[in-house]
Amino acid sequence: MTNQYGILFKQEQAHDDAIWSVAWGTNKKENSETVVTGSLDDLVKVWKWRDERLDLQWSLEGHQLGVVSVDISHTLPIAASSSLDAHIRLWDLENGKQIKSIDAGPVDAWTLAFSPDSQYLATGTHVGKVNIFGVESGKKEYSLDTRGKFILSIAYSPDGKYLASGAIDGIINIFDIATGKLLHTLEGHAMPIRSLTFSPDSQLLVTASDDGYIKIYDVQHANLAGTLSGHASWVLNVAFCPDDTHFVSSSSDKSVKVWDVGTRTCVHTFFDHQDQVWGVKYNGNGSKIVSVGDDQEIHIYDCPI
């Protein structure tokens, strides 16, 4: 166990173009950890994290255009990717094979997320709709309509009750999944919402915007609980730590920041990337952070827990 922050590993030239998305999954059966990256080079890559290094396991071909979003199932060894080619692909992480390709339609599936039970995949669209696909069926099961603009970001609450979406005009919508009803519309940002993340206890929603601010909302009451500044430019990604007390953010200012939820302060900043940092995630126990960016690198950091 480490008691300080530091960079642990750097994978240079991980892709041939900018890396825009990353996911970190734990295979409890094998006690192994998997990192999945999606890049504008049209590839999805699957890496094994072991002995404090990343080893490339699969390079997954199939997308015709850049990969903008990846996620890993919470229950099965499956990854999902969405691309500018308007297709969602499901991949078997045990053999590197494509399970299915879903045509998401002409209004690109920009961002995607597995539901907590991994039975569904939610994707945000250009026309303000969240489309929900069945993982098993590969078909669109239903849609949630924000009546808003292009959706850049979506997140499920870990308890499975809520789905939040963030749009290009800065509007955030929170839906009740059981009823499909729109519960709250939050107007805290005036610029695109690049990312949002629920706390592990599903009580808080953290949002990241091009306005350079991070906002924390109380989900139940839709109250603004905090506004955090510190990044010098667009905030591109946020991810909660499993311990419920910290979250991480990344920015086009080339930095990765770790924040304390209770004190609303930045407790550490990593300046290891050479360009915009598009994706950050914690591992399963919160002891590591992965980040990816336009510099085509994957960085793994140590976190005190």
From Swiss-Prot:
It is found in: Nucleus; Cytoplasm. The modification N-acetylmethionine is found at residue 1. It comes from the Eukaryota. WD repeats lie at residues 14-57, 62-101, 104-143, 146-187, 188-227, 230-269, 272-305. InterPro entries: G-protein_beta_WD-40_rep, SKI8, WD40/YVTN_repeat-like_dom_sf, WD40_repeat_CS, WD40_repeat_dom_sf, WD40_rpt. Its main location: nucleus. GO terms for cellular component: Cdc73/Paf1 complex; cytoplasm; cytosol; euchromatin; nucleoplasm; nucleus; Ski complex. It holds the Pfam family WD40. Keywords: Acetylation, Cytoplasm, Nucleus, Repeat, Transcription, Transcription regulation, WD repeat, Wnt signaling pathway. GO terms for biological process: negative regulation of myeloid cell differentiation; nuclear-transcribed mRNA catabolic process, 3'-5' exonucleolytic nonsense-mediated decay; rescue of stalled ribosome; transcription elongation by RNA polymerase II; Wnt signaling pathway. The keyword Transcription applies. The modification N-acetylthreonine is found at residue 2. Belongs to the SKI8 family. Component of the PAF1 complex (PAF1C) which has multiple functions during transcription by RNA polymerase II and is implicated in regulation of development and maintenance of embryonic stem cell pluripotency. PAF1C associates with RNA polymerase II through interaction with POLR2A CTD non-phosphorylated and 'Ser-2'- and 'Ser-5'-phosphorylated forms and is involved in transcriptional elongation, acting both independently and synergistically with TCEA1 and in cooperation with the DSIF complex and HTATSF1. PAF1C is required for transcription of Hox and Wnt target genes. Component of the PAF1 complex, which consists of CDC73, PAF1, LEO1, CTR9, RTF1 and SKIC8. The PAF1 complex interacts with PHF5A. Within the PAF1 complex interacts directly with PHF5A. Component of the SKI complex which consists of SKIC2, SKIC3 and SKIC8. This is Superkiller complex protein 8. The lineage of its organism: Eukaryota, Metazoa, Chordata, Craniata, Vertebrata.
